[in-house]
């Protein structure tokens, strides 16, 4: 029989902070549904059900837009790895359990909506996309070497990456339904960043030196979204060249996040602050 995990000191210290932020998160939610952002009237069966299989001529959006959407989708597909790391670093009980479950559900909604839109509108090859999904999820995500504080810092940075990526992507999309969907995802990412960033803020009061060191470590190691998707090297370059998300955007968001924590003047963090 599996042993029930026991919360450690930091997990218990942050429990009331998680509760307060969870209450705020739910009180300010703006519920949305994947099916509202999928133009099902554009859909048709694939060959398996007597219709047509996908071919490149069916794509109508610019390549940079579909490349960015596929990167975003594959990242959302791999959220199970992030969920596992959060549970292993903290606990799936009480307010922690409620938050991690809620965060996972909201992130999964992004994957559901994106895949339904892209498959129904035939903007991407569903077979090729599925191959990459399986490959990337099997590769997994591991962060067992991160401390608990580093894990929270990473998540704050990661969610800010998602928000910037989606905002820049939405700004370049002319198709209104997809633009609206990406905007909704961006707004969720902003809320997720706020949650994790608030936990880091509390850590700065609770264990300041460790937290500053964690911020420096994660800032130094952070890469562009999708850098670990081996099959999408060309898509990553296209997205960077289009100004949606690349090294310049990454550097700026790291600087902005550190500044938002009030740490721009910290000696060990000055190298990450621009301007």
Curated annotation (Swiss-Prot):
GO terms for biological process: fatty acid biosynthetic process. The lineage of its organism: Bacteria, Bacillati, Actinomycetota, Actinomycetes, Mycobacteriales. The keyword Transmembrane does not apply. This is Putative acyl-[acyl-carrier-protein] desaturase DesA2. GO terms for molecular function: metal ion binding; stearoyl-[ACP] desaturase activity. Pfam families: FA_desaturase_2. PANTHER family: ACYL- ACYL-CARRIER-PROTEIN DESATURASE-RELATED, STEAROYL-[ACYL-CARRIER-PROTEIN] 9-DESATURASE 7, CHLOROPLASTIC. Binds 2 Fe(2+) ions per subunit. The gene is desA2. Its EC number is 1.14.19.-. Signal peptide: none annotated. Pathway: Lipid metabolism; fatty acid metabolism. Keywords: Acetylation, Fatty acid biosynthesis, Fatty acid metabolism, Iron, Isopeptide bond, Lipid biosynthesis, Lipid metabolism, Metal-binding, Oxidoreductase, Ubl conjugation. There is a cross-link at residue 145 (Isoglutamyl lysine isopeptide (Lys-Gln) (interchain with Q-Cter in protein Pup)).
């Amino acid at each position: 029989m599996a042993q029930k995990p026991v919360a450690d000191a930091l997990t218990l210290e942050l429990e009331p902070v998680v509760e307060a932020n969870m209450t705020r998160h739910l009180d300010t939610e703006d519920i949305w549904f994947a099916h509202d952002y999928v133009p099902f009237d554009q859909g048709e069966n694939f060959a398996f059900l007597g219709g047509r299989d996908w071919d490149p001529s069916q794509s109508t959006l610019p390549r940079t837009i579909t490349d960015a959407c596929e990167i975003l989708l594959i990242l959302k597909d791999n959220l199970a790895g992030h969920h596992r790391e959060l549970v292993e670093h903290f606990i799936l009980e009480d307010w922690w359990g409620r938050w991690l479950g809620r965060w996972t559900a909201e992130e999964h909604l992004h994957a559901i909506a994106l895949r339904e839109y892209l498959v129904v509108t035939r903007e991407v090859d569903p077979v090729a996309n599925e191959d990459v999904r399986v490959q990337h999820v099997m590769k997994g995500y591991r962060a067992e070497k991160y401390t608990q504080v580093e894990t929270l810092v990473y998540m704050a940075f990661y969610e800010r990456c998602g928000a910037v990526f989606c905002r820049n992507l939405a700004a370049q999309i002319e198709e209104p339904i997809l633009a609206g969907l990406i905007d909704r995802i961006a707004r969720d990412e902003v809320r997720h960043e706020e949650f994790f960033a608030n936990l880091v803020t509390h850590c700065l009061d609770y264990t300041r030196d460790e937290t500053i060191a964690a911020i420096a470590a994660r800032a130094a190691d952070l890469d562009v979204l999708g850098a670990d998707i081996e099959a999408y090297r060309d898509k990553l370059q296209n997205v960077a060249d289009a100004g949606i998300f690349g090294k310049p955007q990454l550097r700026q968001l790291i600087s902005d996040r550190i500044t938002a924590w009030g740490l721009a003047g910290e000696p060990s963090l000055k190298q990450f602050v621009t301007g």
